[in-house]
């Protein structure tokens, strides 16, 4: 992940505290834990007692489908994360184990059985169409008004963009996709009318 995207995640983790958005942080697609560690170092010190939920197979990415385009299917890069590296970086940063929930497995297998509760920030770094679609469908409704949804690969992978655009269109969500760099985007879940007037 490039520095601009890390800086943006750091800013958004602080912003959800400033706005007092309730809920935890959820990351789908952890790899070796760099962005997760950054978010955890901010959020676990929050007065709102946030936890960080991390979802990854740690066996690489699933194979892309036709909806991901030729570029994805030709890349041959499957991004195997290392769970031991994730645990090590948390230990080095002094992040309490009680604040971290690591869920190992494929999204379609783990999502149905896990209850995260309210979400203040959802970070999706899942690359492919089906994976991004699963993440949005499973967790968006738990994102609290004023919370943020971060899409890491919107500008790079065709399938990620397609899944995001379809979800926003199908839900009739009128949101602004804020550009972080050539690929990263995020949007804020609309505030309820009473919150917007505060």
Positions of the model-derived regions?
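S-adenosylmethionine/decaboxylated-SAM
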Residues: 3, 14, 19-198
